[in-house]
């Protein structure tokens, strides 16, 4: 519970502008890990220079952060949130589990810059995401997806 609270303490600036922060997260993900852009067919033709102002990237980034907010606010009681998410990411989107590790580090960096996430908060976010990723992976295995 302490890790969830430590991250939520810094969540206000993220929640205040999901579109902007979400765009920053995905743009940085695609910039630092260009192969990840291929996982999003609807973003395939968007050049790096055009991402910052792209409404579709902002909207999807906001969706990612809103789902993370649900997980954070559930404070560990997130099975009902993760199961459908794992199902769609395994069966429809085919997203390998390692990509969640990549986006975790991007979210840590963006929250450090835009929400003042301190060292303790960064560790807490990595811990929360570690549990989330392990639970996603367990669901993937149940579905027979070795992402």
Swiss-Prot record:
Subcellular location: Cytoplasm, Sarcoplasm
Binding site for O2: 60
An individual GO BP term: removal of superoxide radicals
Alphabetical list of Pfam families matching this protein: Globin
Documented EC number(s): 1.7.-.-, 1.11.1.-
PROSITE patterns: GLOBIN
Binding residues for nitrite: 60
Catalytic activity reported: Fe(III)-heme b-[protein] + nitric oxide + H2O = Fe(II)-heme b-[protein] + nitrite + 2 H(+); H2O2 + AH2 = A + 2 H2O
Function of the protein: Monomeric heme protein which primary function is to store oxygen and facilitate its diffusion within muscle tissues. Reversibly binds oxygen through a pentacoordinated heme iron and enables its timely and efficient release as needed during periods of heightened demand. Depending on the oxidative conditions of tissues and cells, and in addition to its ability to bind oxygen, it also has a nitrite reductase activity whereby it regulates the production of bioactive nitric oxide.
Subunit organization: Monomeric.
Protein name: Myoglobin
Organism: Scomber japonicus (Chub mackerel)
């Amino acid at each position: 519970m302490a890790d969830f609270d430590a991250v939520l303490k810094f969540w206000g600036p993220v929640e205040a502008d999901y579109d902007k922060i979400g765009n920053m997260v995905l743009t940085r993900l695609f910039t630092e890990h260009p192969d990840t852009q291929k996982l999003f067919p609807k973003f395939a033709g968007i050049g790096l220079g055009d991402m910052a102002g792209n409404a579709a990237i902002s909207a999807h980034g906001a969706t990612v952060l809103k789902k993370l907010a649900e997980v954070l606010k559930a404070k560990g009681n997130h099975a009902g949130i993760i199961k459908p998410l794992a199902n769609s990411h395994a069966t429809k989107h085919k997203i390998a589990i390692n990509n969640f590790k990549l986006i975790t580090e991007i979210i840590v960096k963006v929250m450090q810059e835009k929400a003042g996430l301190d060292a303790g908060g960064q560790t807490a976010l990595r811990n929360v995401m570690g549990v989330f990723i392990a639970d996603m992976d367990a669901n993937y295995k149940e579905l027979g997806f070795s992402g």
